[in-house]
Structures are given as C-alpha cells and as structure tokens.
Amino acid sequence: MTWLYQDTPIETLPEECVGFVYLITNNLSGRKYIGKKLAKFSKTTYKTVKQKNGTKKRKKIRSKIDSDWREYYGSSPELTADVITLGTENFTREILYYCKSKSECSYIEAREQFTRKVLESRDYYNGHIQVRVHGSHIIDKI
C-alpha cells in the first residue's frame, strides 16, 4: 500500500520536505494512528586522511540517506502487530502535512494528537504523546 496525500498516491516527497505527519487507518476496525516520519536520516562515516606532515587524522563525513518511509507503518507495537496479522492491504496511509524542519514535524504531530484526543479513546493506536519543541522554532514558520 502506498502513501496518499490529498487522495493522490505519492512516490516521492517534495525537495524541501524534511519529514511529514501522517495518519494510518485500519480499514477493518476504523482504528487510527497519528505519527511523524523523517524523509532522510543523517549518516556519519569516518575517513582516515594522511596529512602533509605524515600523521593520520580521522575526518568526519556527514551525509543524508533516504529513510524507510515508503515501507513504514508506524512505531506502535499494537499497530505493527495488526499490520502483520491483517496485512498491509487493510490499512490506509495518508500524509497530513509536509514539514520543513524536525521541530515543525514534532509540533504538528503533537498538535494533531491533542486535537484528536488520541489518548482519550480506544479509536487510536497511540499510547503516548512525547514532544519537546522550543517556541522559537515554530513561531512565524508554520
């Protein structure tokens, strides 16, 4: 099952997209899950460089690699068990928001979870809400 954004199947994410907030729906029971996913992960590798004076120095090389967002079905153990048991064809994955920063992703995910009252109902797989975002990362950026 592919991701949908505004009812359109998505194969690639926009260039400026750092991550996205999503909704996964169990089509059989109606239960839902709100989460966030980063588009790329940072990968650090080390390279040994020989300097002019003959000494060796380790150089950090940082790069971005694609995350597993295409195959991702959330971090909830209960949701993951249902996906394995019922099959991916019984779930709908929707992208609600594209985010331009990690902070924006965290904030919008928590805002959606509080707005939908995910902890107050068994209609959601979400078991906890965890967020820590500084206001300066959000004000005037959303």
What are these regions (language model features)?
Residues M1-I142:
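Structure-specific nucleic-acid interaction/processing domains
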